[in-house]
């Protein structure tokens, strides 16, 4: 009984939080153009342009350099959608005006990474190099052993960075591979070392 009560309380706290997020207007900064056409929202800025289809329960309108997100039907199960779409549109504004970046670090003897046109070319000790093509709006930059993925779409930047990491995941013994810049890799001791010893990088 107590467990059900706790779950119910958590349910209403989370929905209350999401509804508070949804109510907050989104500022439109200078240099950003926003258009709403039926259930589509278009956002354009110096870093690119994005389009998002709105959920059927979500209404968006522009008023005094702000985007207002409201629910068409004020039902509790719509509150999560409300907060989610408000956060999504806010990220679109940030993306086209400032952009998003994700950095990765590669470690390994003989590893080489370069940019060729719109492709990231990774020589990671395999028989052939790994090539990752940049989707529209995504840019690659390589400096020393750091790879930077940039673009206006936060989710796409994160997905491409994840694909790069997956091409050679960091192994736990010598740390060789590709990791996120802020990632902590749990290091394991080799067979000759003491069992259970771990370090971090």
What would you call each of these model-derived segments?
Residues 1-17:
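N-terminal amphipathic/basic-hydrophobic helices that include classical n-h-c signal peptides
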Residues 17-162, 166-201:
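N-terminal intrinsically disordered, cationic/polar leader segments
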